[in-house]
A protein has these predicted regions:
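Asp-based, Mg2+/Mn2+-dependent phosphohydrolase catalytic module
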Residues: 1-6, 18-19, 34, 86-88, ...
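N-terminal helical cap/lid subdomain that shapes the substrate entry/recognition surface
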Residues: 2-110
Length: 205
């Protein structure tokens, strides 16, 4: 069947993520430490990772909502250090905003915009991501006809939910959709299991 729709993963497919996330994480943590000095010692241990795991264990669906999860990690740690709920929520909101600002300081892989522009002339383009990047904020939304994230769907690839939403939005059958992504399980296996075609693309490997 002819390909009519091409969907893309975002992180590590259209841009490298690791260094950006590390820098964003450091900026948020530095802010919290400037407001509550005792948080610095906590953040230098595995406490943050432990809280992350505890929150997911309590509500497994939160793994799909990364912004909410990060906010609650900040809030939990701050309250454990004696901050009131109101104080913790205020600081957590500010820290999350700092993180998200840093998270969007991204540089596309070479040639990405040229490829998207060429593909848009022939195919319906979409985004299927497990992350929380905002393509409008990044200034690349004009290349895409639709975008679905794990936060929006409350589910993550390799579940079929993302791919079914693409079919629903475009009114196309799975075999007419080709998904491109860097992750062999989430992107390739997820797409194939949903009946779509898949291309594994990993600029870093």
């Amino acid at each position: 069947m002819t390909i009519k729709v091409v969907t893309f993963d975002l992180d590590d497919t259209l841009w490298p993520l690791r260094e950006t996330i590390l820098a964003a994480h450091k900026s948020a943590n530095d802010f919290l430490a400037s407001q509550v000095p005792s948080v610095k010692e906590i953040l230098s241990t595995n406490k943050e990772r432990e809280v992350w795991g505890q929150l997911i264990e309590k509500d497994p669906t939160m793994r799909h909502r990364l912004s909410e999860l990060r906010f609650n990690v900040f809030k939990n740690i701050l309250q454990s250090l004696g901050q009131t709920e109101q104080q913790a929520e205020k600081l957590s909101s500010e820290a999350l905003q700092i993180f998200m600002n840093g998270r969007h300081q991204l540089t596309l892989f070479d040639g990405v915009e040229e490829v998207l522009a060429q593909l848009k002339e022939k195919y319906t383009l979409g985004v299927l991501t497990n992350g929380n990047a905002d393509i409008k904020r990044l200034g690349i939304d004009h290349y895409f006809n639709f975008s679905f994230s794990a936060e929006e769907l409350n589910d993550s690839k390799p579940s079929a939910t993302h791919f079914k939403k693409a079919m629903e939005f475009t009114s196309e059958k799975a075999a007419s959709i080709c998904h491109i992504g860097d992750h062999t399980e989430c992107d390739v296996e997820g797409a194939l299991n949903a009946g779509c075609k898949a291309i594994w693309y990993n600029e870093l490997n």
